[in-house]
A protein has these predicted regions:
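Conserved N-terminal helical subregion
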Residues: 4, 46-178, 220-232, 373-374
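Conserved FAD/dinucleotide-binding core of flavoprotein oxidoreductases
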Residues: 81-105, 138-140, 180-257
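A structural signal for isolated positions on well-ordered beta-strands in alpha/beta enzyme cores
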Residues: 5, 28, 212-214
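C-terminal domain-closing interface element
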Residues: 341-360
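C-terminal auxiliary extensions adjacent to catalytic cores
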Residues: 355-374
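Conserved mid-domain beta->alpha element of the FAD-binding
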Residues: 7-22, 26-33, 148-149, 175, ...
């Protein structure tokens, strides 16, 4: 393989580039923005994906903090469950981490170095015998043996493979934010979620004196014409004290809007010499806590297949055969998870009772599935 073109400099594209460079395979990333991802958000990366980053030499401790405990509060703010994520993660080889997305993006970008081209916006792709071609907004073009689309849920490259396909929007929206202080009420290395009918909220320790928090409504898209904080105050009752503390520490321009949309059962993920990975192929809800992990797992597997010396058709076919079931399962689980955490009073009562009385073996299996990606 003489050259791999990557469209998109997000987590998937950067991880793939580092993985290929480690194998000595030439790569170039074209990222449409002329800066690193500049909105301060964060996410949880489970143990199996952290191991991939660590194997690439990524110092994850510089961009986040290990997660030890995940605490869930159900109806009326009552505590219902604590999951010892840290101990279960370490049983499988690495901690799970709460990560500052901006810091991780900046770190990975610097590790990739000059092979990342910023301000290079792909507007179309094509494929000829033995080559994939990308055309850019400034009229220039680039070509490689293969082209890998890592350009996210609103992928431009997807139009080449599946013209007219759009995200399935779920009618859910909210905000996520990172604040430059640690809340006294939040224990170190802990994430808390608060589940109410029609809305869930969460807060997590990012380390380095930072906290991420988020709110997601089940059947409501936030209005741009109304105060963000007022929309939360008016629709989340009772408002958890932890979330109130977050609101008090956050300017509204720090609250990044989110909407839930996904792509289930899209197939194939490739055409000729062009392949999609990450959210370009299998976008999932931002409230699932699994999208970044799936992208990292995609990148690691694809790099191994490219390095194996197989033919391009075999690489693409084998990649989809291995990853599609897992990716579709993540999407289905994210839908179920949003429904579970925001269900109505009666179902919420049943849910809370089940979590409070769940056998330890069952709880451990749930945690094991999360930290291993199964």
């Amino acid at each position: 393989m003489k050259k791999v073109l990557i469209i998109g400099g997000g987590i998937a594209g950067l991880t793939l580039a580092l993985s290929l460079k480690k194998l000595g395979i030439p790569v170039v990333i074209h990222e449409k923005y002329n800066h690193y991802q500049n909105q301060k958000t964060g996410f949880l990366i489970w143990s199996y994906a952290i191991k991939i980053l660590q194997d690439l030499g990524v110092p994850v401790d510089e961009v986040g903090a290990p997660l030890e405990a995940f605490r869930i509060h159900g109806r009326k703010g009552r505590f219902i469950c604590e999951m010892p994520i840290g101990s279960v993660s370490r049983l499988h080889g690495a901690n799970s981490y709460e990560i500052n997305r901006y810091r991780l993006s900046e770190l990975l970008s610097k590790m990739v170095g000059d092979d990342l081209l910023l301000g290079s916006e792909c507007i179309s792709v094509s494929s000829i015998e033995g080559q994939a071609i990308a055309t850019f907004a400034d009229g220039s073009s680039d070509q490689g043996d293969i082209l890998i689309a890592c350009d996210g849920s609103n992928s431009v490259v997807r139009k080449f493979i599946h013209p007219g396909v759009q995200l399935r929007m779920l009618g859910s929206g909210g905000w996520i934010s990172v604040i430059d202080q640690r809340l006294p009420l939040l224990p170190l290395n802990t994430q808390m979620e608060f589940w109410q009918p029609g809305v869930k909220a969460g807060v997590a320790d990012l380390g380095h004196g930072e906290t991420r928090w988020y709110v997601a409504f089940k059947n409501y898209i936030p209005s741009a014409d109304e105060s963000k904080k007022d929309q939360i105050l008016n629709r989340m009752k009772p408002l958890p004290e932890m979330i109130m503390s977050c609101l008090e520490c956050t300017d509204e321009d720090q609250m990044v809007p989110t909407q839930a949309g996904d792509l289930l059962a899209l197939s194939p993920w490739y055409r000729d010499r062009v392949l999609m990975i990450g959210d370009a192929a299998h976008a999932t809800s931002p409230y699932a806590g699994m999208g970044a992990c799936s992208a990292i797992a995609d990148a690691a597997l694809l790099a191994d297949l490219i390095g194996s010396g197989r033919s391009v058709p075999a690489i693409f076919q084998d990649f989809q055969a291995v990853r599609k079931h897992a990716a579709d399962s993540v999407i289905k689980e994210s839908r179920r998870g949003l429904d579970l955490s925001t269900c109505g009073e009666l179902k919420g009562w049943v849910r809370d009772w089940m979590f409070m009385n769940m056998p330890e073996k069952k709880l451990n299996q749930i945690m094991t599935d999360m930290v291993t990606g199964h």
